[in-house]
Regions:
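N-terminal Rossmann NAD(P)H-binding glycine-rich loop of SDR-like oxidoreductase domains
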Residues: 4-28
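Structural motif
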Residues: 5, 73-74, 112
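Short beta-strand/turn micro-motifs composed of small residues
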Residues: 10, 34, 117
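Conserved glycine-rich Rossmann-like NAD(P)H-binding loop of the short-chain dehydrogenase/reductase
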Residues: 28-38
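Conserved Rossmann-fold NAD(P)-dependent oxidoreductase catalytic core, especially the SDR/UDP-sugar
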Residues: 29, 81-82, 90-143, 147-154
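NAD(P)H-binding glycine-rich loop region in Rossmannoid oxidoreductase-like domains
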Residues: 38-39, 47-100, 104-107, 119-123
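Flexible, glycine-rich beta-alpha linker
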Residues: 127, 148-168, 183-185
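A conserved pocket-lining segment of Rossmann-fold NAD(P)-dependent short-chain dehydrogenase/reductase
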Residues: 168-189
Length: 189
């Protein structure tokens, strides 16, 4: 049986590093599509030679995206931003990219598209971040029937900012808890 190929969009980030390590241990061949691939060479050290391919991808170039995805069995979208910049807008990153990836999956022989969203994604949210995440889910699901949406809240791991912050706060006599009515569904990488 041939190794399955998994293309990971945004695979050079915090979640991607752990995901790539686990997938290559299960004999997947990983194509990692990321900005500034020349800075992500360390990812190749996580597996045997040839198991990881890095592709430098401009998120505004969907023909490059098609090239990265076309021979895959599974595509995972990890691309996301927490705040907008002059060049990166929520709508483009969270909605247009998942839509384009899902369309390419439907035109190709892709078995599954896994789209990582966010726990509070909602069309009625006051947050542009949450609205754009919801739009991305809808567009991915509309364009490829084998789309799976994952909605994590906080992602925890040895290098994360969240648990390390709480570790530092633990020396205080009191730890403030804000927003106790919010959903909290952490995932460990």
């Amino acid at each position: 049986m041939k190794n399955q190929i998994c293309t990971i969009l945004g695979g050079g980030g915090f979640i991607g590093r752990y995901l790539v390590r686990n997938l290559t241990k299960k004999n997947y061949r990983c194509i990692i599509s990321t900005r500034k691939a020349f800075q992500k060479g360390y990812l190749k050290t996580q597996a045997t030679p040839g198991a990881i391919e890095l592709i430098d991808w401009n998120p505004n170039n969907f023909s490059e995206l098609k090239e990265a995805i076309k021979n895959s069995d599974v595509v995972i979208n990890l691309i996301g931003i927490l705040y907008e910049t002059r060049k990166q807008k929520f709508y483009n990153i969270h909605s247009s990219i998942p839509e384009a990836a899902a369309k390419i999956c439907s035109e190709s022989d892709i078995k599954k598209f896994i789209h990582v969203s966010a726990i509070g994604a909602s069309e009625n949210s006051k947050s542009l971040y949450q609205k754009s995440k919801f739009q991305g889910e809808v567009r991915a699901l509309e364009n490829f029937k084998n789309t799976v949406v994952i909605r994590p809240s906080v992602v925890c791991g040895t290098e994360d900012n969240f648990t390390n912050l709480f570790s530092k706060l633990s020396i205080l006599p009191v730890i403030p808890v804000v927003g106790i009515n919010y959903k909290f569904q952490p995932i460990l990488v």
